[in-house]
Each structure stands twice: as structure tokens, then as C-alpha cells.
Amino acid sequence: MKVFGDGGLKGRTLSPIVAVTQIPLLQMQIAFAIGLLGVYIGWRGIIAKMTGFYDMAGAFKYLLFGIVSGMVFAVASDEMILQFAVLESRLNIIHAFIISLLIGASESALVMFLLGRPKVVTLRASTPYGWTLGLGMGAMFTSVLIVRLFDPLLGSDFSGFDIISILIGLSIAVIACLGNALISTYQGVGVLNSKRFKTFYTSTFSRGILILGLIATLWQPLLIIFFATLIFYYWPTAQQNGYPLV
């Protein structure tokens, strides 16, 4: 199915409330469970190997920060890009990308603020906290996307509740959680190395690509291969050094 048209993004006019209420409660719970599965993978892959070298309570607190703020940004991405641009075809790809950059800049600004707090910097905890913060943000973005994917009215060839959509959802969960975690930890490295503004611009662009790209995977799942390549390029570094991108 063609996602991007000449004048805008192709899709069906549909309000966010209608889209959500089309799927049963069980399917919505499954969608959020898949999103949280990405948190488990990221936690077991990195945080669980840092035992004794970081503040567990602080890491968990930043995970909650990520979940709460991530839902706000996920809803913004859903209504301003997926709903307004894709389903209602009111924006072209350039305008949609600009909006994704604005959302990405907002995310990066919040991450820079949270990881740059004096107490966090003093503890040298900006990197592990950034990892858990990103996991929470990615989980909520994933959950909203999967709720959309399970909706048969989405207009995608892969929408609806079946094994294919579940597999796509699982792939999105891994990419969104690990992708956001890598980007947030990269900002944490910038905070500790006094390069927070340089990493802010890079992370904003990266988040913009990730947001728009993962939305597009609802129609073009092969994009998962592109993002998976980037994620797993940095994954060995994260496993070897304990912190990603360090």
C-alpha cells in the first residue's frame, strides 16, 4: 500500500477516539503489554548487567518519568502526525517530518533537563538514567502505535489483530525502546562530557527520523530492517562497555 501521495499522506479520515474504541479491551491490553516487553528486553540487556554500579531506585524512577512523559509525546505523535497527516491526508511528507522534528526536539529538551540535573551529574548517573528514561518513552510510543495497528480501520494492509500484526508490533517494541534508550543515553554522555547542546541537535534529528519512520512501518513493515540494522550496530558496544555509545 502506498503511504505517501503527491499532495500528502494517503489514508482514511478517522478520529483518534474512533480508532481506539474499535478494538476490544483485551487487544488494547496486549498492545500495551508488547510495549512494556521492550522495556524488559532493554533492562535485561543493559541495566541488569550494571548491578552495583548505579542507583536502582533512581533508574526505576527515571523509567517512570519516561513512561509518563512518553505517553504525552506518543499521543502528540499520534494526533499530529499519524492522525492529522496520514489518516486525514492534510500534510505532505516534508511537513510531517518538520512536526516529527518538533516533537523530537521537545523530547530531547526534556531528556537534557532531566539528565542534566546537578544531583544526577554529581552521581555520574546520566547514562544509565538516560537508558531507562528512553526505555519508558519508547514503550509508550510503541503501545500507541500497536493500538493503531490492531485497528482494522487503519487502512493498512497489515492492520487488524492477527499473528502478522503481533509480530510487527513486537519488532516495533524492540526498535522503539532500544532506539529511544540509545538516543537518551547518548544525551547522557553529552551531559557528562559538557557537549549537551551538540548531542541535543543530533538526538533531535535522530528522534524525528525514528518517530516518522516507525509510524511508516504500520504501512511498510520492511522499514523495520533499516532501523534494526542501526540498533544492532550499536548493541555490541552497549553489551561490551556496559553503557551504549560510550
Segments (PLM) and residue ranges:
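Hydrophobic alpha-helical segments at protein termini of multi-pass membrane proteins
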Residues: V3, G8-V246
